[in-house]
Amino acid sequence: MKEFFYPEELKKSEIAYRTNKVKPDLRNDFGSYKSLLKTNDFENSMIKFHNDINPTQKLKLIKKITDKFLKNKNNHSILNVGCGTGFETKVLSEIYNCNITGVDVSFDGIEYAKKYNSNSKTEYISEIIDGNFLLNTKFDICYAIEFYPFTRTKDLEFQKNIISSIFNNLSKEGVLVIYQIETDKCDTIKNNIQELSVLLKKNVKTYSKVHPKIYKYIPNYFLSKLCCLVLGKILNRDVGCQLIIFY
C-alpha cells in the first residue's frame, strides 16, 4: 500500500472523509476542512493546525525574494497548488493584484474557499494534482506551500513527475515557488533539489532559514538567517522555512 501523500491515496482519503466512511478526525486535513465548511469555526475545526489563516506577512516576504527571478515582472496569473481552504490564495491575489487559481484535492476545502476566501480575482478548482495534472490556462507563477508531494517524501521520480506536470501548466518563463518548514527530521524535496534541477533542465535557487516574523524586525535575509541559526542552537530545534525556486 502506498503512503498517504501519493495523489491516488489522498483522493481515497478525501472521499472517505467527505462521505462519512471514516470516523471524523480533526487532526486530518480533510476532517478539519469538513468541520470548517459546516461551522466556519476556526477553533473547533482545528484549521490553524492545517492552514495558515493569516499568511500576509509570510507571502509578502516570499514575493519580495521571488520577484528577482521573474523575467516577466507583470504577472497576469498565478497557480496555487494544494491551496486547502484558500486563505493563502486570496492573499496572493491581493498582493500580486492578479488572477489566481487555487487547486486542491479536497472538495470541502474548495467549497469553503469559494464561500469565504473569494474575490473577483480568485478561482477555485477541486482536482487531484498528479503527473497528468493539466488545466486549460497557462500561468506565470505557481506557489506550492507545504505541499505534500514535496514535504513528506524524497521519492525522486514522483517529485520529478509532479514538477513536470506543474510546469506543463506554466508559461514559457514560468516559475515554481516551493515553501515549507525546513527540517532534518524527515525526508523532503530538499534531498533531491540539485538532481531535480538537472533532470528537469531548470535552474534552481534555495533560501534556508526563512522566517517572516524574524525578518519583520531584522529586514535583512542574511542577518535574519543568522538569528534563526542561533535560535535553533539555543532551542535545539529547527527554526525557519526553506524557499525553493525553480525557474
For the regions a language model picked out, list residue spans one by one.
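Conserved class I S-adenosyl-L-methionine
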Residues: 2-70
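Conserved SAM-binding loop of SAM-dependent methyltransferases across substrates and taxa
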Residues: 85-96
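Conserved SAM/SAH-binding beta-strand->alpha-helix loop
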Residues: 106
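Conserved SAM-binding loop
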Residues: 113-114
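Conserved SAM-binding strand-loop segment of SAM-dependent methyltransferases
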Residues: 119-130
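A conserved beta-strand element that flanks and buttresses the S-adenosyl-L-methionine
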Residues: 143
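A short glycine-rich, Lys/Arg-flanked "PGG" loop and its adjoining helix->strand segment in the class I
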Residues: 158-172
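Conserved beta-strand signature within the Rossmann-like core of class I S-adenosyl-L-methionine
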Residues: 173-180
